[in-house]
Amino acid sequence: MNDSYDVIVVGGGPSGSMAAWEVAKAGLSVCVLEKDRDIGCPVRCGEAIGHIGLSQFIEPKPNWIAAKITSVKMVAPNNTNVETDFKKESGYILHRRIFDYDLSRVAAEAGAE
């Protein structure tokens, strides 16, 4: 660990890891500070993400995907419901522990500490 860095990223979740990866790829020194002992544990929020949104940043790995989302059904308290089938874009339910950890490894391999 160095005494100084060009960038300090607070939080090693997906956003922090992606920020650290981009900074490291740009040739700057970066340190990620994470309060939890293990990246991706505990999971902080939902596991759903769209394929196009994720693919803009990184190609999804098969071991990240718990399930593929092809439709959504929303039901209101009064039982009114809306159902949508995704014809062009699908999404994923992610294994967040694996996903978060892998993103932190990508950042580390690019030079983030």
Where does each model-flagged region fall?
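Glycine-rich FAD pyrophosphate-binding loop
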Residues: I8, W21-R44
